Every structure is written in structure tokens, then in C-alpha cells.
Amino acid sequence: MSISSDEVNFLVYRYLQESGFSHSAFTFGIESHISQSNINGALAPPAALISIIQKGLQYVEAEVSINEDGTLFDGRPIESLSLIDAVMPDVVQTRQQAYRDKLAQQQTAAAAAAAAAAAATPNNQQPPAKNGENTANGEENGGHALANNHTDMMEVDGDVEIPSSKAVVLRGHESEVFICAWNPVSDLLASGSGDSTARIWNLSENSTSGSTQLVLRHCIREGGQDVPSNKDVTSLDWNSEGTLLATGSYDGFARIWTKDGNLASTLGQHKGPIFALKWNKKGNFILSAGVDKTTIIWDAHTGEAKQQFPFHSAPALDVDWQSNNTFASCSTDMCIHVCKLGQDRPIKTFQGHTNEVNAIKWDPTGNLLASCSDDMTLKIWSMKHDTCVHDLQAHNKEIYTIKWSPTGPGTNNPNANLMLASASFDSTVRLWDVDRGICIHTLTKHQEPVYSVAFSPDGRYLASGSFDKCVHIWNTQTGALVHSYRGTGGIFEVCWNAAGDKVGASASDGSVCVLDLRK
């Protein structure tokens, strides 16, 4: 048996990532030098740490149930071991002695019962069936115990379940798929994974059910040749014309690809993993945020860094453009900076969160900035004020992400009300009327942390994805659940295509699913 600290650290790091502890994973990864290890993350299956712990727990339970003579204790376990019990020698020894005592009692009771049965049971009378054996009516004695079992999954009306005929599952990734995004002008779906690849899937009508995939391998130069980086693809974004795809990776490089899968540029100035990147609307600049505490504006045509902004005191987690040359960034330092190309200091700084700021989004007009944090609050900011306009407190766990609806002034749906959606580790999604500063709907069907929300292009529906493996589609006006799909892995990201008739979702088991919502 061989166990190295690097291997243990890698499995712990992957567990933190898979469980949604992205900031803890980052800190642990830096302190344990994960990026310097030679372990190929693409070869490790999802939930590897949990799997090996479960096997170890089963071994301890088996060890407890072995008698001194090497035979197995013949009976059901008194109770299964908890993980904490299994690592405590006193508990294991006590449990072993309990098994031995139980065995002695059973042997004594069996001998007494046999003697009594021989004296009292007529020859034509059968003894009652043991628990688990079939009785005359074909049911198991003790079947009532099964009837009392219940599932932890929330009941979903069968009328809203999306049939398998309306779901296409795309397989090819060899590790978790953290992100996905539709091309804004065609039915091409991009996905990014822990297997150090991004993929472009063709879901158009003339494609063979998504079988067409382009593999974008993220490589680095070593020894004069290109080798796989073995690092997660953490972010991706299409330009507004749908001709180019930008990706950010844990290897510290941003890359620009054509929609045909060809590498156009490699952008290398960050000194560590990239957590977020965005095209501006014009398509001439790309904005990235990194663990090195900086944000960078890149010239998309030349691949050169136009300006690096070193204003955060801790890793930058998210960025969003306000205009073609002005943007906001947030960080684990609890601050939000608004910066402009050509300015050597932030033009505005918002402070008020008391924990890491996970995500920021400008509303469609660029007037209001929403932010969400591990402090469980959602805040709305305006460039006209130094303090937040609204401090929305309703979630009881960390808020992971937020999205504005594509409605109201400045959108294609100007007559519909503007809304904001928030997704939290408390397993709920909330819809907010920002003008009034109130929550108008609380969406509660999920059973695990919710990692992603996305509005349909007309704003009438909201998709949500959770680690409970479910994608739910909600009516934004009524808060009613209208569609539901259960996948095969925890959902990290959901997104709508431009036509508003398909939803893409990326999952922890390496799958990407596409839900066809056309009737």
C-alpha cells in the first residue's frame, strides 16, 4: 500500500470543489501546492474521496463483525457505524464485544427455542416465517418496515417532469463539467470541465443528436512541446457575434477559440488560476479575474493585455462589464471596485459585505449593480450612492450566484417588470422586485445547494440547477414549477439558448444535458 500526501491533498481538494466549497478549495489548493503536483485530475472519477472513505467504512464494519475464530457474526448489524465511530478505537472495540455478546445470546436462545418447539409444535404446523422470508401470500413478514421508509427527494408532480425523449445527454468529458454556455446566434453549446478541455456541441436540427463535438484541449508548453495542462477549465464566454469563444483555466491562461474549435490566441499574464472572464458587448475586449488579486482587460484582436488592475487585496472572484470600457469586480476581500480602462485607480469602491463577495451583475441599463456574498445578503448598489441602495436579507446560507431578468428598460422586453434571481446554499431560489426591495417568490423544490439560475430570453421562465441533480423550470410571474428534470450528477450550471426553447445543464458526473422545451 502506498499513500502520498500529494494524493491525499488532491482528493481533499477535489472533494471541496465538488461540494461547492470553491473558496476553501482555492485556499487549500494554494497552501498544498496542488498546481505543482503531477497528478492527472482527468483520471480521477467524481466523488473519489467519498468512494474510498465508504469502502474503508465498510471494511471496518466487516472487521467488527468477525468473530475470534475468523467466522462472520451470523446476524444483522446492531447498527451501522458512523464515520466518526469508525475512527475511534474504543468505539470499535465496544462494538466488537457487543457482537460477541449478541452471538452468545442468540446461541442460548436458539437452543432453548429448539427444545420448546420440539415439545410443543404439532407435526403439521409450520413455524412462523423469519423476517425476510416469503409467507403464503407472497409478501415478506416484516414488510411494514419497508412501507415506513421514505425518500429524501422532494415530490415533483409527474405532469411537469421532462420525459427522457425530450432530453439529450452529451457524454465525452472525463471529469466534472463546471460551466456551459450557448452560442448567442446558433445552437452550439460550449462546456468546460475538470478534464482540462472545453467542448463545443452542435445541437442544431441538422446535427445527429449532439454527436458532433469539438474538443478544445488546453495545453501548455513544456520541453518545447504542447502537453495537456491537466487543470480545470473554470470559465467560458462567447462574444456577442457568436464567432469566438473565450475560456479561462486553472493553469492561469485565458484562451480565444474560433467556433470551429481552433485556438486563436493564448492570453498569459495572470500568475495563477483564472476564476471569471467576460467579453464586452462590442467584442474588442475580454475581461478576466484571477487568484493573483488582479483583473485584466485584454485586446481580443492582438491577445495583448491592455491594462492590469491590481486593486484587490485578495483573489478576484467575478467581473461584469458596465459599458464597453468600464467594469466591476468583486473579491474575497469583501470589496467591490468599479474600474475604467485608462484610469489608474477605481472610479468607485463599494464596501458593506462582511464576507467574500461571490458574484456581481449590472442590470440591463448599467445603473444598478447587484452583489451576493457568503454573508447571506444580496445588496444593490448605485454609482450615485456610496452605500447600498437595498440590503436584501432572506437567505439563511451563502448566496452563490445572481442573475437579472432580461426585462424592463433597455431590453427586448421593455414592458415587463425587472426582476433579480438569487441562488443559495440554503437550497432555495428567490425572485426579487428590486424597485420595492422585496422578495416576490421563494422557490423551494430543490434539496441541495443551488449553483446556477438563468432567465429565458423573454424573462417568463427561470431555470435553476442544484447539486440534487435536478433542473427546475419556473414561471417567473406565479412562481410555479412548470418543468423538472433529474439528471445523473449534481448540476453546476444552467443556460438558455437564444431561441428560448432549449436549456443546457452541466453536471458533476461529466455529463452535459440539453432539455428540449418545445411542445
From Swiss-Prot:
Residues 4-36 form the LisH domain. GO terms for biological process: chromatin organization; regulation of transcription by RNA polymerase II. Its main location: nucleus. Residues 41-86 form the F-box-like domain. One of its GO terms (cellular component) is histone deacetylase complex. Residues 115-139 have a biased composition (Low complexity). Interacts with heterodimers of rxra and thrb, and this interaction is abrogated by thyroid hormone binding to thrb. Interacts with ncor1. F-box-like protein which acts as an integral component of the N-CoR transcriptional corepressor complex. Probably regulates transcription activation mediated by nuclear receptors. May mediate the recruitment of the 19S proteasome complex, leading to the subsequent proteasomal degradation of the N-CoR complex, thereby allowing cofactor exchange and transcription activation. This is F-box-like/WD repeat-containing protein TBL1XR1-A. It comes from Xenopus laevis. The gene is tbl1xr1-a.
